[in-house]
Amino acid sequence: TCALPILLAATISQERLQQQAETAGISAYTRMEQLFILTINELIRQSGQTLEDKTCGLILSTTKGNIDLLTRHTEHPDEAVFLWKMAENIAGYFHAEERVHVISNACISGVSALVTGKRMIENGIYRKVIVAGGDLLSHFITSGFLSFRSLSSRPCRPYDSNRDGLNLGEACGAVLLSTEKTPNSIILSGGAISNDANHISGPSRTGDGLFFAIRQAMQEAGTALQNISFVNAHGTATVYNDEMESKALTLAHLEQVPTHSLKPYFGHTLGASGIIESIVCMHELKQGILFGTPGYETPGVPMPIPVYATHQHIPMKHCVKTASGFGGCNAAIVLSLPEYAPFKDEDNTLPEIRCTREVRIENSSVFINNELIFHSEEPDFGIFI
């Protein structure tokens, strides 16, 4: 392997993890599996909900799982690198082999897992779902982001004019979705997933895909625009992601709602980001504090959005949490304080979906708004797509 340049990243102490794994008797598991098991065990300790309950499902969110095993010589079998094997090992520890599901959908994995868990409960598959998300730093992941020239050697600065890339992080988090309310409950009142099919690694240049996800999530939650207290956006501090998000929020008429990114605090944690950032949003709703976006000084996105570098005390009702990722995927959820149930505001003036681009396929050519953007030499091209 080649040496990587010095970069800023948020890492988990290997020494501390080893100590906790030894105490829990899970040293034989991979590092990723250890983090998942320790995190889920802590959730079980706090909530009292165990996976011995057959009405409780388990969703694991990750982008790469045990991918670090590809570049390390370990005693683990070759199949350990596959997501299904990682899930089998983790679920086996909790005796929940028949109730484990893996969500791996790039950087929206965590938010997608929450939406999936919500739908499973609504469709009567489970009464409760433990949703855990995690990813590790590895040579594979770091070199991949380096190839896109999207990493920064300094603390990331989402939405700032001087942003120059993201910081990676490793983390694991877990939440319990349940039909049973507790005094500390936050309601997952809406959720949606979309895909703009723009590029394998680049976000949409218009923001319409993320806008569709936001609009559908808000429609499901039934909350009016004026009752959204803040937006926790993906905010990676790459040029194109932050530009796209500003356009999407404007399309959704959320351009006046306080917006922030949590990436400067613990980096971009990939499959864990949607989970741990949602946990932070829950605490913000309860405490009435919107965390600042460190490093933000000068607006640097085409559509102005209110971003603050310092913490703000604001009245809380609902928040929108978004994520976007490779392959054009987008996801959004609405988190709500329980006292604002049933979330059906009378003045529900959500923006309507409108056609932003006209796509036409003629012979073997693709036109967008009457402009030729692709031509294939394959005579049956139109049939295949």
Model-derived features: where do they sit?
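Conserved active-site "lid/cap" helical segment
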Residues: 3-60, 213-225, 252, 359-385
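Short acidic/polar capping segments at secondary-structure boundaries
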Residues: 63-65, 106-109, 119, 134-137, ...
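Cysteine-centered functional microenvironments
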Residues: 25-26, 71-74, 97-115, 156-171, ...
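Conserved catalytic cysteine-centered active-site region
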Residues: 3-34, 65-116, 125, 141-168, ...
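Conserved small-residue
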Residues: 40, 58, 110, 117, ...
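Condensing-enzyme catalytic core mediating Claisen C-C bond formation in acyl metabolism
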Residues: 1-8, 151, 155-221, 230, ...
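Glycine-rich beta-strand-to-loop/alpha-helix junction loops that act as flexible
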Residues: 60-62, 132, 233-237
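Structural signature of cysteine-dependent C-C bond-forming condensing enzymes
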Residues: 46-59, 88-99, 122-130, 151-160, ...
